[in-house]
From Swiss-Prot:
Name of this protein: Na(+)-translocating NADH-quinone reductase subunit A
Subunit (UniProt): Composed of six subunits; NqrA, NqrB, NqrC, NqrD, NqrE and NqrF.
InterPro entries the UniProt entry points to: NqrA, NQRA_2nd, NqrA_C_domain, NQRA_N, Single_hybrid_motif
SUPFAM superfamilies, A to Z: Single hybrid motif (SSF51230)
Annotated family: Belongs to the NqrA family.
UniProt cross-references to HAMAP family, sorted A to Z: NqrA
Organism phylogeny: Bacteria, Pseudomonadati, Pseudomonadota, Gammaproteobacteria, Aeromonadales
Keywords assigned by UniProt, alphabetized: Ion transport, NAD, Sodium, Sodium transport, Translocase, Transport, Ubiquinone
GO molecular function terms listed in the Swiss-Prot or TrEMBL record: oxidoreductase activity, acting on NAD(P)H, quinone or similar compound as acceptor
Amino acid sequence: MITIKKGLDIPISGAPEQVIYEAPAVHHVALLGEEFPGLKPTMLVKVGDHVKKGQPLFENKKNPGVIFTAPASGLVTEIHRGHQRVFQALVIAQDPTIGAVSFQRYQDEELPQLSREQVQQQLLNSGMWTALRTRPYSKSPVPGSVPKAIFVTAMDTNPLAASAELIIEQQPVAFVNGLTLLSRLTDGKVYVCKGENSLPHSHVANVEERVFTGPHPAGLAGTHIHFTEPASAKKTLWHINYQDVIAIGHLFASGELYNERIVSLAGPGVSAPRLVRTQLGACLSELTRNQLLAGEQRIISGSVLSGNKAAEVHDYLGRFHLQVSVLPEGREKVFLGWIMPGQDKFSVTRSFMGHLSNVKRLVFTTAKNGSERAMVPIGNYEKIMPLDILPTLLLRDLAAGDTDSAQQLGCLELDEEDLALCTFVCPGKTEYGPLLRKCLTKIELEG
């Protein structure tokens, strides 16, 4: 067992009831480009085409062979592009009568005998290959490549997250089958990183469990990788979340793409926080209709720490997101608020009286409580960073664009979500995730 001592569990109100409900039906789904850094799609469909679930929509020309398939059957209604024609979203109006693409089916006892090439090809053909991400760089793996190890994130310590154990218990056979299939993709270990609760266990020799406890970010893939088998420029690892492992198990058992998602619909802006059963890429404005409290609310695909604002062309559940978080827009001005004791406010530095209050959960809003300013190294980053790195020095190098020093300080191990807590506690209001991505892109291109 690895116990994480540094970190932070944010006392945010609106925690979900850990019971799974059926979500309202959604009529539109989409694939979003922002989740795949450097994506350059070669389109295989156009607006007005009818597509089956699992049908190829586009291929990544920067990573040939990586196919993105339709998460549902229906009509392609929109293809959005942004500045310099950067791909943003492909939207499908659902029509279940069109049907689905069929893939090869296997019996459970056949899975351990499948070759690496068979497993890879089925994942590529179905689009499930995109569920895998590399460290470093957090990109889809190159087809034919072999990782040193694969990490399965079977826990979630994000604020307002769903219980991974509860969801895995719904599909134990598919989860174990998914682990068996992942074990065929590497000569190293498949690490199932989990909390203290028991999970369905795989008997494949190279599948091992690792137990992590402690505050957030104890449940992040970056934390698991750092304390188990760190990544580097010469050592590539893959990671995947537990619901995608279940989806892989279903794909090989049924021969059909499985895009069900159980997500946490929660936060201070939700009237009845709970777990809901929906689908990958679901339209969030449709999913949250009549589910929110009065007032202006911000819908976030993902965690309140590292998720994306769901609005306009981005109004859809992200490929890797297992949460829909809702926060009130913090536009109200408080008269003389800067000198108030702040009994209803949270502060890592205990600048407010909130830490003396009996209120255990606080209503957080989107307000940053101040404009951007210079980095102030007062020890905040060190309080919440459990990884064996020097956070203040690393963040300074990211802000300065010093890629050589950032590499020496461990930036190749990290993803945007690993620095989300640093952004939250930063007195200077700096967003470190985009700075890290800019640095990683430069390193990948220039070394």
